Design a protein with these regions (language model features):
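Short hydrophobic transmembrane-like helices used for membrane targeting/insertion
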Residues: 7, 20-21, 34
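A structure-centric signal for secondary-structure junctions around beta-strands
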Residues: 1-3, 15
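Short, mixed-charge low-complexity intrinsically disordered segments
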Residues: 15-16, 32-51
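A short beta-strand micro-motif
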Residues: 3-10
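Short linear/disordered segments characteristic of secreted peptide precursors
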Residues: 12-14, 25
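GIY-YIG-like beta-to-alpha core
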Residues: 19-27
């Protein structure tokens, strides 16, 4: 199973790497969870695949 780095973007568009998660679905859900939990802190998120 591939691993992904969940990268959060804060309000200043700085990248903040938060977690390494196994599986695309779990990584995406984690990014959405962090967006909802800290919506005043994060603007967006994206995933980077690890090889």
């Amino acid at each position: 199973m591939e691993r992904y780095v969940v990268v959060m973007l804060n309000k200043a568009f700085e990248q903040v790497e938060v977690a390494i998660v196994s599986g695309f679905d779990d990584a995406f859900k984690y990014g959405q969870f962090m967006m909802n939990a800290k919506e005043d802190e994060y603007r967006d998120f994206f995933l980077k695949a690890l090889n």
